[in-house]
Amino acid sequence: HCQIGKEEGYFDLKEVVNGICTKLINRHPHVFNNVDLDMSQFEKTWEELKRDEKGETSITSGLKRIPNHLPALIKAEKIQHKAALIGFDWDDIKDVFEKIEEEYKELLDECKQGNIKYIKEELGDLLFSIVNLARFLHIDSEEALNLTNQKFINRFEFMEENASKLHKKLEDLTLDQMEELWQSAK
């Protein structure tokens, strides 16, 4: 990249290295300027420095900077983390659960109305709140969901194997029979 940049007159290796060094020094005052920061101060300072570097004038611009290509759970976690850095966060886990309950009730209400646009919106709000709970508990929501996905597959495999022992295919069982196998798998 540096060679192409040099050939096209944009930059050379020296400019790239100087830029990287400047960025490292600016973003790490606790290392290069003997500034004592705890982790929350470091993260807050880091975000402020990144905003300054990019000429951003608002916190929202930092939220918009989170890449759209990220999985939605990861993006939601990053959005909530940045909001929490400036103090927009729940004080207590009880508040998080109350928010989840509120969003759940709103989803139920919209399901009764049957408008898919609002159902989708409320489902998104509920998922966002659950990701916030995971963040609040210091649990990676992607990892937690992947564990549950694998648990479901393992239980489903158990059901299928046990149906086979009865000389039946899983899809030939009634829902009650499948539920019985599901409970056995747990």
Regions found by a protein language model. Give the residues of each.
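Flexible "arm" and connector segments at domain edges
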Residues: 1-123, 128-186
